[in-house]
Amino acid sequence: MLLILNLADPDFVARYAQLVESLGFESLWTIDHAVMHATYDSRYPYKTTGRTPLPPDSNMPDPLILMALLAGATERIRLGTSMLILPQRHPIILAKELATLDQYSKGRITLGVGVGWVKEEVLDLKQNFGDRGRRTNEWIEVMKALWDEGVSAYQGDYFQFEGVISNPKPVQEGGVPLMIGGHSEAAAKRAGRYGDEFYPHWSTRGPDKEALETLWPFVTETAAACGRDPDAVKLTLTSTSDAKTSRETAEFCRELGADRVVVLPPKGTLEGSLPDELARFREEVLVPLGGE
């Protein structure tokens, strides 16, 4: 479930996460933007309007700090980013932050990453918008190098180091799992080369069978070319918040081969209708589809 409600209220976030966990949801996902813009020229790729559905004054805490709060409030539910704008972060520091989170959560972290779509945000950070894909690839390689046991070395276009040690290491074998987001050939190839999961997203029209059939071969062929098992790359897709629509969409996602379906939360408060809405969602969607 995507976490987008009342994110500035730590008590709500903790209680909401505990409720979602108790109902058997598999994972909670945080979102990421360093800043939002009241006006922008960049085009949001997942709506025909080109506008993001998030209001510019939305409360959007840092996703890693938010996951630390979630890790302390829960015991079993998986925690991830959907999506962390990877090239906007420093990969050496991020590797340490994620390894620490994985330790403190006892191995429950998944890092979902994308290259970002808001050019204005990238320029605010004094970064190059045009090379964000190349930087994303290198940032992944840097983090994986630092998560290896022992002494690390890396030689790339942006980072070079040798004889360094970054501890603690992630709890999970092979490092924090990577979920690669995007809807392009480049994103699909990135998932095949580096990803544990691929998360194409078409919120304008829901899961797109034709687009997925076009993209998925890039995942599997790239994985095979890199000496990886193509079947080891999992597929995550998106549904909606309405229970009836979500069940139909989730069933369609499963037919497409999805290993996970991320849903949007129903609206409401913990003191009002939200607990009942989530419980209804569990009975009408999770249980019929094989959830707890």
Predicted region positions:
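Active-site-adjacent structural elements that line small-molecule/cofactor binding pockets in enzymes
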Residues: 1-292
